[in-house]
Amino acid sequence: MGPPPAARRREGEPDNQDPAGLLTDKYELTMLAAALRDGSANRPTTFEVFARRLPTGRRYGVVAGTGRLLEALPQFRFDADACELLAQFLDPATVRYLREFRFRGDIDGYAEGELYFPGSPVLSVRGSFAECVLLETLVLSIFNHDTAIASAAARMVSAAGGRPLIEMGSRRTHERAAVAAARAAYIAGFAASSNLAAQRRYGVPAHGTAAHAFTMLHAQHGGPTELAERAAFRAQVEALGPGTTLLVDTYDVTTGVANAVAAAGAELGAIRIDSGELGVLARQAREQLDRLGATRTRIVVSGDLDEFSIAALRGEPVDSYGVGTSLVTGSGAPTANMVYKLVEVDGVPVQKRSSYKESPGGRKEALRRSRATGTITEELVHPAGRPPVIVEPHRVLTLPLVRAGQPVADTSLAAARQLVASGLRSLPGDGLKLAPGEPAIPTRTIPA
């Protein structure tokens, strides 16, 4: 027995064109149906997004996904096809509600690119129970993914010590996740991505030249591999110019470097090494390039890099890094483990009291204290609208993002990149360490 008609994809239709409203969990809609039936659907509520803890050993996280959420909100609707599917398990009144659904509430939260810590009220969603509960899965799927990627990327940026990083993970994740990952990595400080969709959609600079296949394509049956490599390099330079990046480890790195300089001359832009003992090979390649007169040719390394291997290469003559699998999987922490919890009903605080999952009730805002030098010292979470009197330097973190369903915040990637960079500079001495440790600053919550 096949799927019901409403669930079948139309022939020829891309499989990524599901109505945005269906990018959710079924229980959001069954809760809505019950709330509409008993009259509680329109009660004013506040839901809060936060992480109870950072991934094991991490000292900070980076908020990402805000811009994508604000972009997704107007699209989060239920069209005729979606409603046909939902009518199989929802009553007519609920389907009618969904057919007309628009989020018309308010959202406050941390700006994209802001650092966060355990208990930080990253997002506060206000509106009727009906409209807020429908957003839960959308909010968490965006923030848990993008924040995990940005947090890992920021650690890699710190480990690189100012050397550029290129995101190259598209082939290691879902095609739509790849675009979001490229965006999140760029926010965290990566210089570019190999993903063209991220360039088109978000303006992320795209980099890329050739893979090993292009070199092997030029092999002649029974002929020397050196001749194949020379032919491939000549073809690439003729097409892209001497400033291109030539991949020199298809056969032998030493021979590859010699062939690269022979093809492009001393103006060769860069070589890339994708395998082997990268530090040793980079040193040998640098010496060889300098001997051949290619003193300005850069060395790019790639191949299963993460923040730890990047840090280990800081003393080597490496000019930039290409990072793939580790980046798009959050470098061991593929989710930020953020939650979306009801904290207020009719203006009255409510809270969950389950063991190990208790969370303070009430709508909250936050500010961050610092020393006169700019080094941050504490995250202070307080009841919304009741900030404490503080004489030390501090910065308000909770900002208006959406009003009456309409975005009101600056979601430019340039602003987010700047916020990440300044946030990393503000961490105390141990905050940038890669070794496992406690959060860089404590979070203190003033009860409602």
From Swiss-Prot:
Keyword flag Transferase: yes
Region (Disordered): 1-21, 353-372
GO MF assignments: nicotinamide phosphoribosyltransferase activity; nicotinate phosphoribosyltransferase activity
Keywords: Ligase, Phosphoprotein, Pyridine nucleotide biosynthesis, Transferase
PTM characteristics: Transiently phosphorylated on a His residue during the reaction cycle. Phosphorylation strongly increases the affinity for substrates and increases the rate of nicotinate D-ribonucleotide production. Dephosphorylation regenerates the low-affinity form of the enzyme, leading to product release.
Protein name: Nicotinate phosphoribosyltransferase pncB1
UniProt-listed GO biological process terms: NAD biosynthetic process; NAD biosynthetic process via the salvage pathway
Role description: Involved in the Preiss-Handler pathway, which is a recycling route that permits the salvage of free nicotinamide (NM) and nicotinic acid (Na) involved in the NAD biosynthesis. Catalyzes the synthesis of beta-nicotinate D-ribonucleotide from nicotinate and 5-phospho-D-ribose 1-phosphate at the expense of ATP. It is not able to use nicotinamide. PncB1 contributes to basal NAD level.
Phosphohistidine: modified positions: H212
Record-listed E.C. numbers: 6.3.4.21
Reaction catalyzed: nicotinate + 5-phospho-alpha-D-ribose 1-diphosphate + ATP + H2O = nicotinate beta-D-ribonucleotide + ADP + phosphate + diphosphate
Upper lineage: Bacteria, Bacillati, Actinomycetota, Actinomycetes, Mycobacteriales
Amino-acid biosynthesis as UniProt keyword: no
Reported phenotype of the disruption mutant: Cells lacking this gene show a reduced incorporation of nicotinamide. Double mutants lacking both pncB1 and pncB2 show an absence of incorporation of nicotinamide.
Family: Belongs to the NAPRTase family.
GO annotation, cellular component aspect: cytosol; peptidoglycan-based cell wall
Gene for this chain: pncB1
